Amino acid sequence: MTHQTHAYHMVNPSPWPLTGALSALLMTSGLIMWFHFNSTTLLMLGLTTNMLTMYQWWRDVVRESTFQGHHTPNVQKGLRYGMILFIISEVLFFTGFFWAFYHSSLAPTPELGGCWPPTGIHPLNPLEVPLLNTSVLLASGVSITWAHHSLMEGNRNHMLQALFITIALGVYFTLLQASEYYEAPFTISDGVYGSTFFVATGFHGLHVIIGSTFLIVCFFRQLKFHFTSSHHFGFEAAAWYWHFVDVVWLFLYVSIYWWGS
């Protein structure tokens, strides 16, 4: 790899995809163990493995891009295509949850009382915490765009300020969502309403946590002067992902919270 005469990055063998897959297996198995047997051992093991994998994989990517110069324009182009395909796959992932929701709500079965929300379910008021959550995420979309424009103009301080605001709003959203779950008058086991509500909003919440982590990494990288106005794909990918999370929430809010209530 040291003496390459082409613009492409031949990646060195890495253990992180394997440990990442192992952590995913441990986390999903751990969730089942937690739900059914109230044991969090596997889940904690999975989360720890996942955190270690993320740290070391990100460290390697930063080393390759910033310090070894492997991310040439051709490589960045490939990474952009990869990120676009990843976001498309995420769109299809959430399509499944919306499909389940509309399949259940547009033609409620007699078991549900022939109505939606099902008999006995008291839905959350869409004009309370969900509306606040919507405004928080929309504001974070504005601040991430401000950060991007500041980076393009070479204004480092404004970029850091805007990025910090975005991260703070992302954390605030997560805390609001957690409090809403804690106070919700129904649970994930309350029939198809509880299942579709908690799975769809829960996976969105997980994506907000992933996006916030991505932005925190970008924040620390910017503190170390890793980004320039012409070389910042790591931040660009995080911004694309954050906008995707924003748009998914708008669909969730309109479908599940507002129309579905």
UniProtKB/Swiss-Prot annotation:
Q: Kindly indicate whether the keyword Mitochondrion belongs to this entry.
A: yes
- One Gene Ontology biological process: mitochondrial electron transport, cytochrome c to oxygen
Q: Which UniProt keywords apply?
A: Membrane, Mitochondrion, Mitochondrion inner membrane, Translocase, Transmembrane, Transmembrane helix
Positions on the Mitochondrial intermembrane side per record topology: 35-40, 106-128, 184-190, 257-261
Enzyme class, one word?
A: translocase
Q: What is its EC number?
A: 7.1.1.9
Could you list the residue ranges that cross the membrane?
16-34, 41-66, 73-105, 129-152, 156-183, 191-223, 233-256
Q: Which Pfam families match?
A: COX3 (PF00510)
What this protein catalyses is: 4 Fe(II)-[cytochrome c] + O2 + 8 H(+)(in) = 4 Fe(III)-[cytochrome c] + 2 H2O + 4 H(+)(out)
Which domain of life does the protein's organism represent?
Eukaryota
Tell where it localizes: Mitochondrion inner membrane
What spans does the record annotate as topological domain Mitochondrial matrix, numbered to this chain?
1-15, 67-72, 153-155, 224-232
Where does it sit, as one GO cellular component term? Answer: respiratory chain complex IV
Q: How does it sit in the membrane?
A: Multi-pass membrane protein
Q: What is its main location?
A: mitochondrion
GO MF terms here are: cytochrome-c oxidase activity
Cross-referenced InterPro entries = Cyt_c/ubiquinol_Oxase_su3, Cyt_c_oxase_su3_dom, Cyt_c_oxidase-like_su3, Cyt_c_oxidase_su3-like_sf, Cyt_c_oxidase_su3_a-hlx
What the record says about family reads: Belongs to the cytochrome c oxidase subunit 3 family.
Assembly description:
Component of the cytochrome c oxidase (complex IV, CIV), a multisubunit enzyme composed of 14 subunits. The complex is composed of a catalytic core of 3 subunits MT-CO1, MT-CO2 and MT-CO3, encoded in the mitochondrial DNA, and 11 supernumerary subunits COX4I, COX5A, COX5B, COX6A, COX6B, COX6C, COX7A, COX7B, COX7C, COX8 and NDUFA4, which are encoded in the nuclear genome.
Name this protein carries in UniProt: Cytochrome c oxidase subunit 3
**Protein's gene:** MT-CO3
